[in-house]
Amino acid sequence: MKLIIGLGNPEARYSNTRHNIGFEAVEALAAAFGAPFSKGKGKYLVAKIRHRGEQLMLVKPMTYMNLSGHAVVAAMNFHKALRSDILVICDDMNLPSGTLRLRSKGSAGGQNGLKHIIESLGSEEFARLRIGIGLEEKPQGGYSSFVLGKFSTDERNVMNRTLEVCTEAILDFAVNGISHAMNHYNKPVS
């Protein structure tokens, strides 16, 4: 069993924002399998899919991004998941738009959702998939206005293709492990 956690903010006003690309990733995978989200045993929504004999629990924390660790711990406890079973998906403004970066462990790198998960788990030892949202220069309104901003039409086109590849990367992780997925998907989406 794998726990695939897409990070985002739960309110409708955050829909289609750069910061919610993690939600979009798990939503795209759930849609591809026709799996609906329902309330989990904690502050999260969950959809269940099966791929090549592997069960995947797709999780959307219903806490704000900066408190994602609470939902992750609740989901891990309920589903009896180990850190090696989880993949956390989030935005990364330091990666070019449309670039995927899988890692088996590491720091938060300035991503507050990851930071809270690391604090809550007491460890950086879990896989993550960062999706580049392409900050090219310091935004006038500050970093939070950038990540909480909506995608432009051009950005949305790039993200739609990126989400297709992201779905493949998640399934590869679930079946073949993080090292295999890293070797195949750590590159810009073309």
Curated annotation (Swiss-Prot):
PANTHER family according to UniProt: PEPTIDYL-TRNA HYDROLASE
Protein name as annotated: Peptidyl-tRNA hydrolase
Cellular localization per UniProt: Cytoplasm
Family: Belongs to the PTH family.
Broad EC category: hydrolase
Active site, UniProt feature: H19 (proton acceptor)
UniProt-listed CDD domains: PTH (cd00462)
Keyword Transmembrane helix among record annotations: no
Ligand binding (tRNA): Y14, Y64, N66, N112
EC number of the protein: 3.1.1.29
Keywords for the protein's UniProt record, in alphabetical order: Cytoplasm, Hydrolase, RNA-binding, tRNA-binding
UniProt gene name: pth
Site (Discriminates between blocked and unblocked aminoacyl-tRNA): N9
Keyword Ligase: no
Quaternary structure, from the entry: Monomer.
Gene Ontology BP terms: protein quality control for misfolded or incompletely synthesized proteins; rescue of stalled ribosome
Any one cellular-component term (Gene Ontology): cytoplasm
Pfam families the record matches: Pept_tRNA_hydro
Chain positions of site Stabilizes the basic form of H active site to accept a proton: D91
